[in-house]
A protein has these predicted regions:
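N-terminal Rossmann-like FAD-binding beta1-loop-alpha1 element of flavoenzymes
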Residues: 2-29
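Short glycine/serine/threonine-biased micro-segments
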Residues: 6-8, 37, 44, 48-49, ...
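Dinucleotide-binding Rossmann-like beta1-alpha1 core, especially the glycine-rich loop
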Residues: 46-100
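Loop/helix-junction capping segments adjacent to catalytic residues or to phosphate/diphosphate-binding pockets
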Residues: 14, 38, 97
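Short N-terminal amphipathic alpha-helix/helix-capping patch enriched in small hydrophobics
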Residues: 12, 16, 32, 44, ...
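Glycine-rich FAD pyrophosphate-binding loop
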Residues: 21-43
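Short coil/turn connectors at secondary-structure junctions
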Residues: 1-2, 25, 43, 85
């Protein structure tokens, strides 16, 4: 018997499973593919979102910044390479007034 069933072993499902492994929780991950991250997560750009499009002060903006900050620690914990490449965002003249740097 499991306490938690996690549907999908993509980025989100795997992150949830990792977090729950820190507690006394009996969890199982149910995945339709033969391996983890073989669906949508496999087709990502492998770039950590810079949060450039979120409206300042919103929950999305705060979570973008926090998640980005946590990547260094996560990379160390998992012993995986991680390099900050930066971002280049192009906007039109109409968008310059709304651009946040």
């Amino acid at each position: 018997m499991y306490d938690v069933a996690i549907i999908g072993a993509g980025v989100v499902g795997s992150a949830i499973a990792r977090e729950l492994s820190k507690y006394q929780v009996n969890a199982c991950v149910i995945e339709r593919e033969e391996d983890v991250c073989n669906g949508t997560s496999k087709a990502n750009s492998a770039i950590i979102h810079g949060g450039f499009d979120a409206t300042p002060g919103t929950l999305k903006a705060k979570l973008n910044v926090r998640g980005n900050f946590l990547m260094d620690e996560l990379a160390r914990d998992l012993d995986i390479p991680f390099k900050r490449n930066g971002s280049l965002v192009v906007c039109t003249k109409d968008q310059i007034g709304r651009a946040h740097v």
